[in-house]
Structure formats: structure tokens, C-alpha cells
A protein has these predicted regions:
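Solvent-exposed loop/turn segments at secondary-structure junctions
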Residues: 15-19, 83-87, 103-105, 117, ...
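Periplasmic-binding protein-like
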Residues: 43-44, 48-52, 91-116, 158-161
């Protein structure tokens, strides 16, 4: 809404995430986004919505760029990795506020190479790194995850010893009311096709 909230918008230079945001901005419920995006009409609808702000978009490619764009005043709002905004807001008192409504959650994964000589050691590491306490401890440094529900009660304070991390977690129930989890299967099947169209659209 450029009229209600004037100013430039920062968006990642990629189809993934932006098409989902566009459909939600156009009134599609979070739970229906991928069902709609799986149709030609849905894709067209997403691009049509993006077109309404295209002239006001500043495209970013690296995760470090959104906080820089905000701090410099080049954009009024931007999509971003939440951890990239949290740290400068807390440690440098930057006036950044995260809008959780419509957030998209993306998961990272561990993989073990088939045939590795260290299979047992690798399995031990994956088991440890995805267990309850280590995932909660990770949140001491950056507010990502934890992906395991059992970790939530153990999330403590930021490394400054003062800032409670729980309210800053994407997985905090208060932050998940209108969230969607990125559909990795959808993007595995459609990424090349949709991103090619996206790149061509940017260049028009």
C-alpha cells in the first residue's frame, strides 16, 4: 500500500518468496497460497500485484543489504531475514521493527554424503545439533528457529544477557498467526520456470 505507507520497498531479487508475498497482499489466505500459485492464473495474479509496486522497488541480493537500505533511508520497508534486522536493532539501537504478519518460514537441512567413511560420527552430529537444548542455545546468538517445539521453553537471553529472545523467534506463537512455511517441493518443481519469468519481468 504505497499510498498509506509511502516510500521505496526492498525486495529480494528472486521469484521465491516474492510471489507468495504478492498473493497474500492481494488477499489470498496464507493457507491457500501454494494452491493458488500452482495455477497459471495464480502466477499471473502474483505478477500483476507485484507490478503495482515495481517502480518503487529496490532489489537486493545479499542478506546484509536490507538493514543497510533501511539505515540509509533508501527504503521505507523491506523484506529481510529477521536475524539480520534483530542484531543492529539491539546492538546499535537501529529503529527497525519487524512485521511478522505474513512471514515466510524457510528451513535449512543437514545431509550426509552417501558412502561417507564417517557415517556414525555424522549421524551423531546431526542428532546432537537438532536436539532440544542445542537448538535452544543457538538462539542465544541469532533469533532463528528453533525448529523443534521442545526447544521453545529453553530459549533464553541474547548474548548481551538482557534481551529475552523468545519474543523475537519466528516460531513464537504470537509471530506465527499468519505465517506460511515455504513449500520446498513446489519450488523444486517450479523454481527455474518461475524465476526465469521473474528475471524477464524485472528487465521489462
Amino acid at each position: 500500500d504505497l499510498k498509506k505507507f509511502p516510500g521505496k520497498r526492498g525486495l529480494k531479487k528472486e521469484a521465491k518468496v516474492n510471489l507468495e508475498f504478492a498473493l497474500m497482499a492481494d488477499g489470498v489466505a496464507a493457507g491457500d497460497v501454494y494452491k493458488v500459485l500452482a495455477t497459471k492464473e495464480g502466477v499471473d495474479r502474483a505478477f500483476k500485484k507485484l507490478e503495482t509496486i515495481k517502480s518503487s522497488v529496490v532489489w537486493w541480493e545479499a542478506g546484509a543489504q536490507p538493514p543497510q537500505l533501511l539505515a540509509s533511508g533508501e527504503v521505507t520497508m523491506t523484506t529481510a531475514y529477521n536475524g539480520r534486522l534483530f542484531t543492529p536493532a539491539v546492538t546499535e539501537n537501529k529503529p527497525f521493527v519487524i512485521i511478522w504478519d505474513g512471514q515466510q518460514q524457510v528451513f535449512d537441512n543437514w545431509a550426509i554424503v552417501k558412502g561417507t567413511k564417517n557415517k556414525d560420527l555424522a549421524l551423531d552430529f546431526v542428532a546432537f545439533s537438532t536436539s532440544t537444548k542445542p537448538l535452544a542455545d543457538q538462539a542465544t546468538y541469532i533469533p532463528y528457529g528453533p525448529a523443534r517445539k521442545s526447544s521453545a521453553p529453553f530459549v533464553g537471553k541474547f548474548e548481551d544477557g538482557k534481551t529475552d529472545m523468545a519474543p523475537h523467534m519466528p516460531t513464537n506463537p504470537d509471530n506465527m498467526k499468519n505465517a506460511i512455511v515455504q513449500d520446498v517441493k513446489f519450488w523444486a518443481d517450479k523454481y527455474d520456470e518461475l524465476n526465469e519469468r521473474f528475471v524477464a519481468w524485472i528487465g521489462k
